[in-house]
Amino acid sequence: AELFQSRGGLVHLNSPVSKIQKKQDGYLIHSGQKTFEARNLVNCAGLHADQIARQAGLRPKLRIIPFRGEYYEFKPERSKLVNHLIYPVPDPLMPFLGVHFTRMIDGTVEAGPNAVLAWRREGYRRSDISLPDLAEIFAFGGFWKLSARFWKTGIEEYRRSFSKKQFVKSL
């Protein structure tokens, strides 16, 4: 960001975009009470990047389907079992890395993440739900293709999400 700014670029943090208008020589970006004018845009909107791209007049072939990863922390007396990162052998048929063990800088050890569909783009808890986000997910054909291909894995991931015993057993 510093290099970008040093060359004349502007960075607007914490500025939710409500509307983007394409002009002949650039864009008008509306955010709250402010309007920004730009010749070019750099989209760093994370989980909202596909929505911003569509607002800018692009038609991306992809959509972001939000997944949430959950971690469990080892009991302190079990932390000595893991001295370094441990990754599973990847399954080339799966789009996810798999649950791994990570020794943190404070000596604790975490196991995770799993991968479960988030019911909201920024849904980090099971209780985070957005009906508009769900409607967008379910309206996207790519979601149904993914679901048809990995439905068994999806069910297993949810079982492990709702049962710590099943999560631990799968390690």
Residue ranges and their predicted role:
Residues 7, 36-38, 157:
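Flexible, glycine/proline-enriched loop segments at strand-loop-helix junctions
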Residues 1, 6-7, 25-26:
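Rossmann-like NAD(P)H-binding beta-loop-alpha module
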Residues 15, 30-33, 151-152:
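Short amphipathic alpha-helical segments at helix-loop
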Residues 3, 51, 55, 170:
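Alpha-helical scaffold segments in soluble metabolic enzymes
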Residues 20-129:
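Flavin-dependent oxidoreductases
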Residues 5-17:
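A conserved beta-strand/loop element that lines the FAD pocket in flavoprotein oxidoreductases
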Residues 59-61, 77-79, 104-106, 114-171:
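Flavin-binding catalytic cores
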Residues 1, 14, 46-50:
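Hydrophobic, well-ordered secondary-structure segments
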